[in-house]
Amino acid sequence: MHPKRRLCWCLPASGAWAFMLTSLIADTTACESEERLFHKLFSRYNQFIRPVENVSDPVTVHFELAITQLTNVDEVNQIMETNLWLRHIWNDYKLRRDPREYDGIEFVRVPADKIWKPDIVLYNNAVGDFQVEGKTKALLRYDGMITWTPPAIFKSSCPMDITFFPFDHQNCSLKFGSWTYDKAKIDLLIIGSKVDMNEFWENSEWEIVDASGYKHDIKYNCCEEIYTDITYSFYIRRLPMFYTINLIIPCLFISFLTVLVFYLPSDCGEKVTLCISVLLSLTVFLLVITETIPSTSLVIPLVGEYLLFTMIFVTLSIVITVFVLNIHYRTPTTHTMPKWVKTVFLSLLPKVLLMQRPLEQEKKNISKKTKKGSAKTSGKSKHSKHKDNKLHKEQRCCHCDKADDLTSTRRSRLSHQSLKWMAEHTEYSPEVKDVINNVQFIAENMKSQNETKEVEDDWKYVAMVIDRVFLWVFIILCVFGTAGLFIQPLIADT
């Protein structure tokens, strides 16, 4: 190989080896510097002693809360589970150094169990450890400033009011403070007035409306010292879409099905069947959604009140339907209609409810036609009476020879004289008398049947009026009862 080409190939290779060797030496130097730094910082360090130069001075701890997830809200056990990051910032004078002595190293990550930490705990913790585990590392700056941000999952106790479930709001708090150090030893300062929600994952059931923090100085009965705590209040609102679609709307439909019971005619025989079917469907529905409703005896939730209202609604409709059917099938042989029933249910309420019987309308039309025709026939009344008398005399003389004429002419006189009077005061053959008696029996029987049918129709009409009354009553109760129940959360918010 040519010497010049060999030299050109060797120069880049030697440069790469030189760069790698320099980097290795630099890394080795940095590792040695960091090792010297750790040895210098922790060789005589005691993590159990408060990092203050003067014993009377407090350690100022800056505290901030960041929430990443609202995991669960247990209404029955009154527990709120959250995933949090707790940021602690304080200064430890014993860990200060000059970065120039250690190759410019300004930040080091140190195990949290090797340094002193403020014993900040969650006062209202319900399940698990009250204190944060020190398995994460802390960031140590050259001037002794320590930033420690451990993650934690807390299950905090939260008194809950589910009166307006599922349109309820809850106010849950997290109270942090030192468990053993009073304000003279540790002074907590809050960073900002709000919870950091930059890394928050939205919850499918709850929405955080507001999350504010406050500092409190409290003197407890057990001790004379004043203790400092920082309390974060989470004002959360339940998203009611799931319960509205799967709980409230089906109950609303069941309520309106109950209203339709009173629109169903009594003659169809399906009124009680429809009522029982609605009641059974509501019962099955309640068994399905029992686990969805918070099981508590402290208060009755709003949706529980609505379900109870619907159950009473359906049960009452069954009772009223049985009563209406009892009235519908009454007859003159079993019941006598009182006068007040006729006045109220046959005259007064139908006018109020804008109901009108077809027979009454026909009677009105006939009476109008009669009044119009009475004026035309008044002038011919005397002539007709004279003609009837003459015809009567002729029939008495020749009643045997003109039997056919007797039948045709007496049709007009049946409305003026009874058949009984005719049979007693007129001499007829036995055959004619039998015919008259039979006709009289048939007429009386038909009259009795017509009277019975009129009374039965009156009872049926009374039942129809009662149905119409309760139809409007149940519509009003259903609309205003439903609106009144679900307007309560809006009124409570205002």
UniProtKB/Swiss-Prot annotation:
Instruction: Tell me the lineage of the source organism.
Output: Eukaryota, Metazoa, Chordata, Craniata, Vertebrata
Signal peptide residues are 1-31
Q: Tell me how this protein assembles.
A: Neuronal AChR is composed of two different types of subunits: alpha and non-alpha (beta). CHRNA6/alpha-6 subunit can be combined to CHRNB2/beta-2, CHRNA4/alpha-4 and CHRNB3/beta-3 to give rise to functional receptors. Heteropentamers containing CHRNB3 have an stoichiometry of (CHRNA6:CHRNB2)2:CHRNB3. Interacts with LYPD6.
Gene3D superfamilies, per database record: Neurotransmitter-gated ion-channel ligand-binding domain (2.70.170.10), Neurotransmitter-gated ion-channel transmembrane domain (1.20.58.390)
State any GO BP term from the record: synaptic transmission, cholinergic
Mind telling me what this protein is named? Neuronal acetylcholine receptor subunit alpha-6
Protein's membrane topology? Multi-pass membrane protein
The portions of this protein that span the membrane are 241-265, 272-290, 306-327, 469-489
In terms of SUPFAM superfamilies, this protein maps to: Neurotransmitter-gated ion-channel transmembrane pore, Nicotinic receptor ligand binding domain-like
Q: Which reaction does it catalyse?
A: K(+)(in) = K(+)(out); Na(+)(in) = Na(+)(out); Ca(2+)(in) = Ca(2+)(out)
Superkingdom of the source? Answer: Eukaryota
A Pfam entry, by short name? Neur_chan_memb
Segments for region (Disordered): 364-390
What is the recorded function of this protein according to its Swiss-Prot or TrEMBL entry?
Component of neuronal acetylcholine receptors (nAChRs) that function as pentameric, ligand-gated cation channels with high calcium permeability among other activities. nAChRs are excitatory neurotrasnmitter receptors formed by a collection of nAChR subunits known to mediate synaptic transmission in the nervous system and the neuromuscular junction. Each nAchR subunit confers differential attributes to channel properties, including activation, deactivation and desensitization kinetics, pH sensitivity, cation permeability, and binding to allosteric modulators.
Q: Which cysteines are joined by disulfide bonds?
A: 158-172
Its annotated compartments are: Synaptic cell membrane
Control of this protein's activity is summarized as:
Activated by a myriad of ligands such as acetylcholine, cytisine and nicotine. CHRNA6 nAChR activity is inhibited by the antagonists alpha-conotoxin MII and PIA, a small disulfide-constrained peptides from cone snails.
Predominant location:
membrane
